[in-house]
């Protein structure tokens, strides 16, 4: 498949695709009522599916007694984005801060729905984060979010299941060895992993194979996507299709569903190839596996020590005319994403983005 379009067209198409159930009209700013409570405190609302973020609230409020923070889980990625789009379209009900993955951030920036945090001094943090995460939030000369986490890939596995199968994942380096390990795990009744058609996972694995199906024209504007003629894309597709054909991957259990968590919990799905942010999700979604999970390097096509990324997200501020709420929201974002104590509290069980 080959497709060529301008960057602007791609951004607009992507933005339109995210406008599920959103009316065609409405304000792009958050017109919620003043956030000042009866006690004179400024109240801010944060939407985030990150289970570690609420841990930071108590210490933040202690250090900032004039601010009250309410963290709400409005759903994971696309579920949250739909709710956010609906609120933005209606002109009310949007949060002050919202967790947005790096891939989705440009869509909200293009539509003018999030604040440039440079006005609060966020630009000075350019050397604090890894280059990749900083580049993901620095758009069109502005800083439109603060990085929360990053997603270098890792192989998380249930040691009990792999011990039963007689497989040591730390010695599995190539995709051929991964295939052999999958057969042994399947013989125990479990699947080595699951994949119900995750496009993000597909991207991550093709990048791991060395694929570069996306290219920018000499004009700096046109973008070409060519999947069918990239040999490295074929390397992954052929390998993964063989795994599926041989019933070595659970393709029926949807990722992030209750059944998926149940399968991780009981060992039916024995491992995951995913972002380094996964540990705290395992702790909350598969509590019976506590103490059983381990991590190994990603197996690669030829065993070389290369890696890819999967996911990663940021805290962005929804456009607002309320200066007090904006300043309070930025203080919390900086505390959670930059302050040493805030980061220490959040990254227990994860990998920071610096």
Which residues make up each language-model segment?
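Short helices/loops that flank or line small-molecule/ion binding pockets
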Residues: 81-93, 111, 161-162, 180-187, ...
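Extracytoplasmic/periplasmic substrate-recognition and gating elements
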Residues: 238, 245-246, 285-352
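Short helix-initiation/N-cap motifs at beta->coil->alpha
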Residues: 73-83, 103, 173-179, 252-266
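A structural signal for short loop-to-beta-strand junctions that line the ligand-binding cleft
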Residues: 86, 94-96, 125-161, 191-192, ...
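Paired acidic/hydrophobic, glycine-rich loop segments that form the ligand-binding mouth/hinge
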Residues: 96-99, 270-275, 294
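Conserved N-terminal structural module of periplasmic/extracytoplasmic solute-binding proteins
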Residues: 2-106, 287, 302-303, 324-325, ...
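Glycine-centered hinge/linker elements that transmit conformational signals in sensory
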Residues: 182-183, 222-253
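Hinge/lid segment of periplasmic solute-binding proteins
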Residues: 102-153, 179, 205-207, 294-296
């Amino acid at each position: 498949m080959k497709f060529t379009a301008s960057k602007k067209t791609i951004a607009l198409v992507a933005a339109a695709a995210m406008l599920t159930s959103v009316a065609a009209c409405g304000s792009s700013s958050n017109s919620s009522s003043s956030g000042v409570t009866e006690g004179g405190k400024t109240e801010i609302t944060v939407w985030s599916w990150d289970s570690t973020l609420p841990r930071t609230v108590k210490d933040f409020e202690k250090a900032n007694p004039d601010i009250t923070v309410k963290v709400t889980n409005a759903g994971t990625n696309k579920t949250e984005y739909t709710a956010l789009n609906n609120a933005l379209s209606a002109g009310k009900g949007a949060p002050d801060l919202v967790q947005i993955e790096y891939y989705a951030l440009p869509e909200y920036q293009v539509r003018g729905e999030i604040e440039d945090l440079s006005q609060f001094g966020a630009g000075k943090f350019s050397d604090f984060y890894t280059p990749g995460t900083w580049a993901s939030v620095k758009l069109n000369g502005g800083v439109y979010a603060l990085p929360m986490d990053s997603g270098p890939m890792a192989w998380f596995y249930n040691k009990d299941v792999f011990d039963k199968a007689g497989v040591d994942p730390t010695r599995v380096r190539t995709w051929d060895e991964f295939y052999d390990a999958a057969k042994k795990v399947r013989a125990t009744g479990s699947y080595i992993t699951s994949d119900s058609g995750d496009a993000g996972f597909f991207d991550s694995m093709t990048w791991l194979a060395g694929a570069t199906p996306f290219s920018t024209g000499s004009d700096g504007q046109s973008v070409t996507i060519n999947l069918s003629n990239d040999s490295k894309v074929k390397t992954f597709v052929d390998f993964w299709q063989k795994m599926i054909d041989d019933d070595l991957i659970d393709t029926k259990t949807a990722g992030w569903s209750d059944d998926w968590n149940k399968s991780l919990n009981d060992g039916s799905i024995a491992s995951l190839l995913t972002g380094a942010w996964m540990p705290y999700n395992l702790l909350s979604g598969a509590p019976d596996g506590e103490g059983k999970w381990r991590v190994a390097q990603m197996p690669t096509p030829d065993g070389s020590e290369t890696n890819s990324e999967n996911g990663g997200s940021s805290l962005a501020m929804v456009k607002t005319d309320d200066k007090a709420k904006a300043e309070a929201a930025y203080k919390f974002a900086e505390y959670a994403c930059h302050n040493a104590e805030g980061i220490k509290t959040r990254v227990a069980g994860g990998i920071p983005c610096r």
